[in-house]
Design a protein with these regions (language model features):
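Conserved SAM/SAH-binding loop
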Residues: 70
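Conserved SAM/SAH-binding beta-strand->alpha-helix loop
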Residues: 90-91
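Conserved SAM-binding strand-loop segment of SAM-dependent methyltransferases
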Residues: 101-112
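Conserved alpha-helix/loop element of class I SAM-dependent methyltransferases that forms part
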Residues: 42-62
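A short SAM/SAH-binding and catalytic strip from SAM-dependent methyltransferases
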Residues: 120-140
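N-terminal auxiliary segments of SAM/dcSAM-dependent transferases
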Residues: 1-26
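SAM-dependent methyltransferase
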Residues: 2, 151-213
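A short glycine-rich, Lys/Arg-flanked "PGG" loop and its adjoining helix->strand segment in the class I
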Residues: 139-152
């Protein structure tokens, strides 16, 4: 990643150091919006939604935290006694995670995980990081790759947003826009901006619980539990078959 592309990392680093920062999200249909802000990446367990607290209780053994960011989930799991490896594509976010006390962090994309990292009992993709699967095709490829780095009774703990739980016209129109292009309704193409920084464009996959179950068919994984929030966010426990 080039220095000027680490918008996410820069906002996280500035918030960590100075308590300032914001996050602008630009979608490929022209929608520009402010996210909840970098403070969300530093929340403690007491601030998490009930759906997340229920799901994270199913973590066991050695953990791979995919898209660890500033390390909020890694830190919690470390305190619970888990051996955690956090990975993130953002060098600055990884730096912040280390500064905050995450013992093992690597700068790498999820597509590069391999048996060289060892064997994991749980993979966590929280903070809506189910989205890192990006598309139906890539999800199935990654799920197969995950089988090569996990124990026989492994779990994947995920969090995402049900894209259909909205009545906002610009989101509903975007679903139609995606389907016309042969994409999943919640297959969002976006980039993050902060000051003069901008990430490359990337896909971020949002799915309903039913779509998640369909996506996992034939992959050697299954959705075991779903925990809904009062809004569109939900978490799920995925088990290896």
């Amino acid at each position: 990643m080039k220095k000027g592309q680490d918008a996410y990392g820069r906002e996280v680093y500035d918030y960590f150091k100075h308590g300032t920062g914001c996050e602008i999200v630009e979608r490929d249909d022209g929608l520009v919006s402010m996210s909840t802000g970098p403070d969300a990446y530093f929340t403690e367990y007491r601030d998490w939604g009930a759906h997340l607290k229920k799901a994270i209780a199913f973590v066991r053994g050695r953990v791979l935290d995919v898209g660890c960011g500033a390390g909020r989930h890694s830190l919690y799991l470390q305190k619970k006694g888990h051996d955690v490896l956090g990975i993130d594509t953002s060098p600055l976010a990884a730096k912040v995670a280390r500064l905050r006390g995450v013992k093992r962090v690597r700068v790498m994309p999820v597509t590069k995980v391999s048996s060289r990292l060892g064997t994991f009992d749980t993979i966590v993709m929280l903070g809506n990081n189910f989205g890192l699967f990006e598309s139906r095709k890539r999800a199935r490829w990654l799920l197969n790759r995950f089988r090569s780095i996990t124990s026989e009774d492994a779990r994947i703990i995920v969090e995402t947003v049900d894209p259909y739980r909205t009545d906002e016209r610009h989101h509903l129109n975007y679903h139609k826009f995606n389907r016309r292009r042969g994409r999943m309704s919640g297959q969002t193409r976006l980039r993050v901006r902060y000051l003069t920084y901008a990430t490359p464009w990337f896909d971020y996959l949002l799915v309903s619980p039913d779509e998640m179950k369909q996506l996992l068919e034939g992959t050697g994984w299954r959705v075991a539990k779903v925990f809904r929030s009062k809004g569109p966010a939900y978490s799920a426990v995925i088990e290896r078959l």
